[in-house]
UniProtKB/Swiss-Prot annotation:
Its main location: membrane. It is a multi-pass membrane protein. Part of the ABC transporter complex UgpBAEC involved in sn-glycerol-3-phosphate (G3P) import. Probably responsible for the translocation of the substrate across the membrane. This is sn-glycerol-3-phosphate transport system permease protein UgpE. Belongs to the binding-protein-dependent transport system permease family. UgpAE subfamily.
């Protein structure tokens, strides 16, 4: 007998619609503010009808920055993209090779090495960040893409997830590869890597957003304005000297900052969902 859940379904849909509206309303307000001029954005209460100045504000910050910040926001977006993409590729490469070595290579203390990697998750960021900055400074990597990305490429979480996935692969695959004369890297490239594509897609999305949203690390590691990132740069656009903040331009910068991660999620959403589902099996 099929249970009649019409009332429950209606309630759930109403709650979902309310939740979506609560999430989208601040984004809509930011969009409206980005479309106003300098005088309209300070009117109280601010209008909720979009104005005609969106592209003008975007063009201004893209080439000239916001307010006294003369760094073009287009350059900040480029720095953020380079940082996020390098961190993503580095994390996935290091993690998948580490997990592959731990699962398929028989060497002494391999489980100990895995647990030493896993234990780094228990160290708070505040404990690790200042020693890392000192190392980067001693290597003369401040104000560089290498300094922005290299310390964030190691990931115990991704290594753990890849290890757990590799352990679910049947041993018959390895035995068949050995019979066919495939070496370790051939087995990895032709068999393990194609089977891991959904997990790779899920980790790519998660890691890209992680790298894109970095705020504290770029602030600590860079002093050159030309190496600033978008997320960290937005904070510098807000006036702290008593001068009015040009909120229309700040909101335009925030809208631009949202676009790259949204595009990544939309392009890879099918593989992303499949990767999350496969990782739970």
């Amino acid at each position: 007998m099929i249970e009649n859940r019409r009332g429950l379904d209606i309630f759930c849909h109403i709650m979902l619609i309310i939740g979506v509206l609560l999430i989208l309303f601040p984004l809509y307000v930011a969009f409206v503010a980005a479309s106003l001029d300098d005088s309209q954005v300070f009117q109280a209460p601010m209008t909720l009808i979009p104005g005609p100045h969106l592209w003008q504000n975007i063009s201004h910050i893209w080439h000239a920055g916001v307010g006294n910040n003369s760094t073009p926001f287009g350059l900040m977006l480029l720095n953020s993209f380079v940082m996020a993409f390098a961190i993503t590729v580095g994390k996935i490469t290091v993690s998948i090779l580490s997990a592959y070595a731990i699962v398929y290579f028989r060497f002494p203390l391999r489980n100990l090495f895995f647990w030493l990697i896993f234990l780094t998750l228990m160290l708070p960021v505040e404990v690790r960040i200042f020693p890392t900055i000192e190392v980067i400074a001693n290597l003369n990597l401040l104000d560089s893409y290498t300094g922005l990305t290299l310390p964030l490429m190691a990931s115990a979480t991704a290594t753990f997830l890849f290890r757990q996935f590799f352990m679910t692969l049947p041993d018959e695959l390895l035995e068949a590869a050995r019979i066919d004369g495939a070496g370790a890297m051939r087995f990895f490239w032709d068999i393990v890597l194609p089977l891991s594509k959904t997990n790779l897609a899920a980790l790519f999305v998660i890691t890209f957003i992680y790298g894109w949203n970095q705020y504290l690390w770029p602030i600590l590691i860079t002093s050159d304005a030309s190496m600033g990132t978008a997320v960290a740069g937005i904070r510098s656009m807000i006036s702290t000297s008593g001068a009015p903040t040009q909120w229309n331009q700040v909101m335009a910068a925030m809208i631009l900052t949202l676009i790259p991660p949204v595009v990544v999620v939309l392009l890879m959403q099918r593989w992303f969902v499949r990767g999350l589902v496969d990782s739970e099996k």
